[in-house]
């Protein structure tokens, strides 16, 4: 009976019934095989014992004898008998006829009623094996031995006594398992174009030529291996022919590299003798167990890189141990211990194998402990490493060591009596000295509040002027603006103490202020220090602070007699500012502000007379003048002694005349002239 699909030319081909072997579940295949000597013949016979309407085909080649084909079929019939009876899940292809396991090819062309060959690969790439299955073919066999997930496949060349280790890798050239091949499928029809990936050790087409010799083409050689593996990594494969080497470079596709230097996981090649007596099910079970063991071993993914052989990995090229996918180990107790995940296409090296192949020492990442503790790397544990690690500790020790050496009594004296915690006036509320405030803002406030490497603010300042000019108030407001602790010490009180006690107190003050930065120390009446030893100690402290730009420490000294300061001590001040008495506008502002609660009843002429008479008064003395005038106004009102007045009356000009008799300025004209002359020479 002639099949309507079989061409007439195929019926003339030679066919020997000895090579016919019925298959239970393989669909109809029509092959047109070209041969140099003779043409193969195909003949289909309906296998009536099967109820599913399957066909059995016999195929023969004139290149081998019938006896050789019978021996080969007998040898592999027992091996594949159990696999052929297993059910095969056919893919749904709509209205097409039922295809075989891999589809059919007719003379290299797909018939219009047959679907395209399907594989088990989900990425749509070409299969590792040809999309057809041939029956009763002798010669070497190419059988996949991979039991890994889709995308990873192993190929082994099988013959009578040959075994080859399958090279595996993350590839889309994944063919079906050995259970899905016909009993005597020959690798002759396996073209190199079916496998675009370099991960499979698939020999070229010339390796699969039909030979009566049962060995695997001893004449096959190549000069350029597909992978640039080191010679020490892969042992000699005794099962292969002596002249057989890896496939040539043309099997590598252009978009992919030949082989990365770093390969994933601690994978090893397993030499499996597929051509032996071990069944394919055992091979698949072994490969599956090896895959599970590799997945369970987290440490194999975090080893040093080397040229370890590859092994079947997961279906994803990037293996992340952590389920969250963020690269951090979930079982780590170290909150800062980062364990990077390496891709499965890379391999790692055991700790004892470090430097075995590369000859270099491994780079050990620095260990970070909890609470910010830092441990230097192994390369920094020498002198440099210890210095870098102890920099912050040494700096803290420098700050804390002076505090430990301070006498507790002196420390308590500085903390309780010398530290001034009284509220300071706002910088904008300071009356008078507008030019001095502007100079301090430019020289000190802006460089401190907005640091600039090119601008260094002054660390030692001298404020000189008559008594009551507001030098202390200005210094206190300045410390409040820069957010520094304020310490105040009178040099007149310091000079009255014993020499040893005065020096110890001065040293304690500077030590505490240095340890509690930012800080400001105000030394008033600095001209009172006449003792040589105490003056030299103060001079040494000022020079130390002046040349150390990293400290947030400011020293302000005030004096009303700058002419009495020694020149050696005077040179220790970076800036010198003259704080004079308030002028007419400042005095007017102070008087009106002080009289605002009761109201000012003075006329403009009377107010001008009061301002003219108050020349030489300081701000503090002007406030005393206003208070005395208010008291005089309250006393002149006829109010009973024990009764409260309805409202306080505003002072009159007569009240101010009475106040001038009781409040007098403390600065002398000689003192004012001295400060003015000294300011012209030494003031900045």
Curated annotation (Swiss-Prot):
Gene Ontology molecular function terms on file: ATP binding; ATP hydrolysis activity; microtubule severing ATPase activity
Reported cofactor(s): Mg(2+)
Tissue: Highly expressed in vascular endothelial cells and neuronal cells.
Localization per Swiss-Prot or TrEMBL: Cytoplasm, Cell cortex
Protein name: Fidgetin-like protein 2
Function as written in the Swiss-Prot or TrEMBL entry: Microtubule-severing enzyme that negatively regulates cell migration and wound healing. In migrating cells, targets dynamic microtubules (MTs) at the leading edge and severs them, thereby suppressing motility. Negative regulator of axon regeneration that suppresses axonal growth by selectively severing dynamic MTs in the distal axon shaft and growth cone. Contributes to proper cell branching during endothelial and neuronal development.
Keywords per UniProt: ATP-binding, Cytoplasm, Hydrolase, Nucleotide-binding
EC top class named in words: hydrolase
Binding annotation for ATP: 431
InterPro entries: AAA+_ATPase (IPR003593), ATPase_AAA_core (IPR003959), MT-severing_AAA_ATPase (IPR050304), P-loop_NTPase (IPR027417)
Annotated catalysed reactions: ATP + H2O = ADP + phosphate + H(+)
GO biological process: microtubule severing; morphogenesis of a branching structure; negative regulation of axon regeneration; negative regulation of cell migration
Biased composition annotated in UniProt, kind: Low complexity: 160-179
Region (Disordered): 27-48, 99-179, 292-403
Gene transcribed to yield this protein: fignl2
């Amino acid at each position: 009976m002639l099949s309507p699909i079989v061409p007439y030319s195929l019926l003339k081909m030679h066919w020997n019934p000895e090579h016919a072997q019925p298959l239970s579940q393989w669909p109809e295949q029509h092959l047109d095989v070209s041969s140099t000597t003779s043409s193969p013949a195909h003949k289909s016979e309906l296998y009536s014992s099967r109820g599913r309407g399957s066909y059995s085909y016999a195929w023969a080649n004139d290149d081998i004898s019938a006896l050789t084909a019978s021996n080969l079929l007998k040898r592999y019939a027992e091996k594949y008998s159990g696999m052929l009876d297993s059910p095969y899940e056919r893919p749904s292809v709509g209205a097409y006829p039922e295809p075989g396991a891999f589809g059919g090819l007719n003379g290299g062309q797909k018939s219009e009623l047959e679907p395209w060959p399907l594989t088990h690969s989900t990425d749509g790439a070409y299969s590792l094996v040809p999309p057809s299955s041939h029956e009763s073919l002798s010669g070497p066999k190419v059988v996949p031995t991979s039991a890994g997930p889709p995308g990873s496949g192993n190929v082994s060349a099988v013959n009578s006594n040959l075994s080859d280790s399958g090279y595996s890798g993350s590839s889309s050239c994944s063919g079906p398992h050995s259970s899905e091949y016909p009993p005597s499928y020959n690798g002759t029809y396996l073209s190199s174009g079916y496998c675009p990936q370099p991960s499979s050790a698939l020999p070229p087409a010339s390796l699969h030529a039909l030979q009566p010799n049962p060995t695997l083409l001893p004449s096959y050689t190549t000069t350029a291996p597909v992978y640039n593996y080191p010679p020490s990594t892969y042992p000699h494969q005794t099962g292969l022919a002596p002249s057989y080497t890896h496939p040539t470079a043309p099997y590598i596709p252009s978009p992919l590299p030949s082989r990365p230097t770093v390969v994933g996981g601690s994978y090893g090649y397993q030499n499996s003798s597929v051509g032996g007596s071990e069944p394919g099910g055992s091979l698949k079970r072994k490969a599956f167990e090896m895959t599970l063991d590799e997945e369970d071993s987290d440490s194999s993914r975090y080893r040093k890189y080397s040229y370890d052989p590859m092994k079947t990995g997961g279906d994803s090229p990037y293996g992340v141990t952590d389920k969250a996918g963020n690269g951090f180990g979930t079982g780590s107790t170290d909150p800062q211990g980062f364990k990077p995940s390496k891709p499965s296409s890379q391999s790692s090296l055991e700790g004892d194998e470090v430097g075995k192949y590369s000859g270099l020492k491994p780079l050990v990442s620095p260990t970070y402990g909890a609470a910010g503790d830092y441990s230097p790397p192994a390369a920094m544990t020498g002198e440099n490493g210890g210095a870098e690690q102890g920099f912050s500790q040494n700096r803290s020790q420098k700050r804390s060591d002076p505090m430990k050496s301070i006498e507790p009594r002196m420390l308590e004296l500085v903390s309780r009596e010398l530290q001034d915690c009284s509220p300071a006036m706002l910088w904008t509320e300071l009356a008078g000295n507008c030019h001095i405030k502007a100079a301090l803002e430019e020289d000190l406030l802006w460089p401190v509040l907005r640091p600039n490497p090119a601008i260094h603010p002054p660390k030692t300042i001298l404020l000189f002027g008559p008594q009551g000019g507001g030098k202390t108030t200005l210094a206190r407001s300045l410390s409040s603006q820069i957010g520094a602790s304020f310490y105040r010490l009178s040099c007149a009180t310091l000079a009255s103490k014993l020499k040893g006690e005065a020096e110890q107190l001065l040293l304690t003050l500077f030590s505490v202020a240095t340890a509690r930065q930012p800080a400001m120390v105000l030394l008033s009446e600095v001209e009172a220090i006449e003792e040589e030893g105490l003056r030299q100690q103060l001079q040494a402290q000022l020079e130390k602070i002046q040349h150390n730009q990293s400290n947030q420490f400011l020293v302000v000294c005030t004096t009303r007699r700058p002419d009495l300061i020694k020149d050696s001590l005077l040179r220790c001040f970076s800036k010198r500012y003259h704080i004079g008495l308030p002028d007419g506008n400042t005095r007017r502002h102070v008087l009106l502000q002080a009289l605002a609660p009761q109201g000012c009843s003075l006329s403009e002429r009377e107010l001008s007379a009061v301002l003219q008479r108050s020349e030489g008064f300081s701000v503090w003395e002007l406030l005393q003048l206003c208070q005395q005038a208010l008291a005089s106004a309250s006393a002149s009102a006829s109010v009973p002694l024990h009764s409260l007045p309805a409202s306080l009356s505003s002072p009159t000009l007569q009240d101010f005349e009475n106040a001038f008799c009781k409040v007098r300025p403390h600065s002398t004209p000689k003192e004012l002239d001295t400060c003015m002359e000294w300011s012209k020479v030494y003031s900045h």
